[in-house]
Amino acid sequence: DDLIQGRAGIIILLLLMYKTTQDKMYLDIAQKVGTNLVESIQSKNCLAGMAHGYSGMAVAMALLGRYTGEENYKEIVLELCRKEDQLFDSSMNNWCDIREGKEHPRNTVAWCHGSAGILLARALIHKISGLTMDQLFKDIPLNQVIDQMCQTEKTDWCLCHGQAGLLIVERYIRHVFGYEEEKWYENAAKYLDKRLSIEDVLNYGMMQGLVGIGIFLLFWEWERD
């Protein structure tokens, strides 16, 4: 049911096809897939996060609401957020990564798992649906979560789970949430001066390799201009 290889990703693809072609067939199929997704997750516990968890599904539901004009999708989005928030750990200011089971939660901060992807998803949902920050985060200490994410240092620079991905997410959420935007430039420059290295990067792909790092560097130059 997730974004990367499940129904949530299929819904987003179908809606993009509908936006491009205006063929209602794509919208109808997206709604059917959405119904199947909602029914599927009622009977199971999912992961937190954008790539493989509740957040990716919530983005798909928000887009369905936007393209169909049906308000009930907002309630589904909020239900998914509340389910995800059951995995929030205030001692970490993060949502637990339970890929290894609830008995062994991990404090993962990345686009794919953890706070970075979840913050990005809810920022997107806010822009798509108009749901407020109070509605989306409810009892979550948003500023502390953002601060914790921004202070996370990674050992690699890939988009998926490295420093480049975190910095791009940080730029977007600071802008959407109106949270100390000027600090992004200082933070990005600090990590670039201190840690950027591609000597050990053997993957040439976008999400986990050199292409993704190149995209970040272009993004950095664009933002500085």
Regions found by a protein language model. Give the residues of each.
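Glycan-recognition and catalytic cores of secretory/periplasmic carbohydrate-active enzymes
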Residues: 1-225
